[in-house]
């Protein structure tokens, strides 16, 4: 399926890709962008690959890319990082618009292990931030945030609630940015 006159988006991911799968499914219902490339330092889930193939999307897939370099980045309007846990090459940062989905309400809890640190510090809220990527870790302009109330000291429950919040809202936030 060729999506004409749609913004070209490259996605970066490290984990299972549940946010990416949700974003891609919602985009198929009402196409707002063309996913031109998926890049992971891990394996990309079979569900995502099946979705790409069954909908005849012209999307390149790169897996197990241990060092992201400019050679993997083609023509795109924006790069959207959804759970990408590696540093991005400064040359890529300098030459592309990059948006990151971060699992905390920035500026708090930059970097990794955000849920554990929220619980250690007895935070009342959790949430995510969508921000521009700069050469400084999780320090770019915040474009959007969404929060929820922490109801338990269980890290697994917090993580599940957090994923649910992201799945319900991230696509809308991404589309607002692309318009």
Regions found by a protein language model. Give the residues of each.
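One-carbon transfer enzymes
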Residues: 1-179
């Amino acid at each position: 399926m060729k999506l004409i006159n749609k913004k070209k988006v490259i996605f970066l991911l490290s984990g299972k890709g549940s946010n990416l799968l949700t974003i891609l499914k919602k985009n198929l219902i009402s196409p707002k962008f063309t996913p031109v490339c998926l890049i992971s330092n891990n394996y990309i889930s079979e569900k995502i690959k099946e979705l790409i193939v069954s909908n005849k999307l012209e999307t390149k897939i790169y897996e197990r890319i241990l060092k992201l370099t400019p050679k993997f980045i083609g023509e795109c309007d924006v790069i959207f990082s959804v759970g990408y846990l590696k540093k991005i090459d400064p040359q890529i940062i300098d030459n592309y618009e990059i948006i990151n989905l971060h699992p905390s309400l920035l500026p708090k809890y930059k970097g990794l292990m955000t849920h554990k640190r929220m619980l250690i510090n007895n935070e009342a809220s959790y949430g995510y931030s969508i921000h521009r990527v700069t050469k400084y870790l999780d320090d770019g302009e915040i474009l959007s945030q969404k929060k929820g109330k922490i109801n338990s000291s269980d890290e697994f429950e917090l993580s599940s609630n957090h994923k649910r919040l992201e799945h319900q809202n991230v696509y809308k936030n991404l589309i607002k940015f692309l318009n």
